[in-house]
Swiss-Prot record:
GO biological process: rRNA processing
Matches recorded under Pfam families: YbeY
GO molecular function, one term: metalloendopeptidase activity
Similarity field: Belongs to the endoribonuclease YbeY family.
Cofactor: Zn(2+)
Classification via Gene3D superfamilies: Metalloproteases ('zincins'), catalytic domain
Free-text remark on how the cofactor is bound: Binds 1 zinc ion.
Protein name: Endoribonuclease YbeY
Keyword annotations from UniProtKB, A to Z: Cytoplasm, Endonuclease, Hydrolase, Metal-binding, Nuclease, Ribosome biogenesis, rRNA processing, Zinc
Enzyme category, top tier: hydrolase
EC number: 3.1.-.-
Cellular compartment(s): Cytoplasm
Major localization listed first in the record, in broad terms: cytoplasm
Gene name in the database record: ybeY
Amino acid sequence: MEIWVNNDQEIVEFTEEHEELIRRVAERALELAGAGLGSNVSVSVTLVDDETITDLNRDHRGLASPTDVLSFSQLEGEDMGDLPEGEPMPLGDIVISLERCVSQAAEYGHSFERELGFLTAHGMLHLMGWDHQTPEDEARMMAKTEEILAGLGLSR
């Protein structure tokens, strides 16, 4: 699995340990929820501030407010059969607001690392086709997210 992590904000300190955490969570999510995808996939994770994610949220969802994570899947309606042999299949892009990550960690009473892991897992599940439009889907997605995090020592 190829994972590109880009820190495009300067408000929240972002360390190599945080980048490694994102990689471990993304790999674990693929392992537990990516049935049929294999491991030759790629994903990008971009870390932004609230201003940037507000702009993206407005442009793509029509909501002029910050959010914690956005996912842009490459699998939706795409034919990936034309990829050159050996090239990783692009799952898509995850955008995480580190400002939201800090505030939500404080609000929920857990660590920044646990929240960063949660947002990464949540974004990965969306890239792999999971959603939370119904209460049943939301419960299923939350349970899978918690399973991913528990396997990495990030449970509540």
